[in-house]
């Protein structure tokens, strides 16, 4: 890819932001409501639900599903506003693992697939992928939605 130092395995990781708790303003308590991007939710209720970290990868690919070494079961698909490509929803098939992922193409660049993972796998990788390093060289990582 253009603009990357091919000598570094981590060169394509343009940005990685870790999920952080919303900041509370002076005088607010943790159970108070926090307004974020047009919707409000209780900080306390997101703790009870056990909100998981989310990571998004942008990859240039002709196929929507990249082999990441885990096995996935598709459980849904929906049309998304302002995007002609549907978003697909998957769950890890390993018993007791609650990791989910969403896959969708970008409208502005149809060759880019955005894969968003929610959670951390509770088991080792199920199958080795020979092309995993090739996938890593094409990825951009984003986090915190």
From Swiss-Prot:
It is found in: Nucleus. Signal peptide: none annotated. SUPFAM superfamilies: WRKY DNA-binding domain. GO terms for cellular component: nucleus. Residues 20-55 are annotated as: Disordered. It comes from the Eukaryota. Keywords: DNA-binding, Nucleus, Transcription, Transcription regulation. The keyword Transcription regulation applies. SMART domains: WRKY. Residues 20-38 have a biased composition (Basic and acidic residues). GO terms for molecular function: DNA-binding transcription factor activity; RNA polymerase II cis-regulatory region sequence-specific DNA binding; transcription cis-regulatory region binding. Its main location: nucleus. GO terms for biological process: atrichoblast differentiation; lateral root development; negative regulation of transcription by RNA polymerase II; regulation of response to nutrient levels. Residues 61-126 bind DNA. Belongs to the WRKY group II-c family. Transcription factor. Interacts specifically with the W box (5'-(T)TGAC[CT]-3'), a frequently occurring elicitor-responsive cis-acting element. This is Probable WRKY transcription factor 75. It comes from Arabidopsis thaliana (Mouse-ear cress). The lineage of its organism: Eukaryota, Viridiplantae, Streptophyta, Embryophyta, Tracheophyta. The gene is WRKY75.
């Amino acid at each position: 890819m253009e603009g990357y130092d091919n000598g570094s395995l981590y060169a394509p990781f343009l940005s990685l932001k870790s999920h952080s708790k919303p900041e509370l303003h002076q005088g607010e308590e943790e159970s108070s409501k926090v307004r974020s991007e047009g919707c409000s939710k209780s900080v306390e209720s997101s703790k009870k639900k056990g909100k998981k970290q989310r990571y998004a990868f942008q990859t240039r690919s002709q196929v929507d599903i990249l082999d990441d070494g885990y096995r996935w079961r598709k459980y849904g698909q929906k049309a998304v506003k302002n995007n002609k490509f549907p978003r697909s929803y998957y769950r890890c098939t390993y018993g007791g693992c609650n990791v989910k992922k969403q896959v969708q193409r970008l409208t502005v660049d149809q060759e880019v697939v955005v894969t968003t993972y929610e959670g951390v796998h509770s088991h080792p990788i199920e199958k080795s992928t020979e092309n995993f390093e090739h996938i890593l060289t094409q990825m951009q990582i984003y986090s915190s939605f």
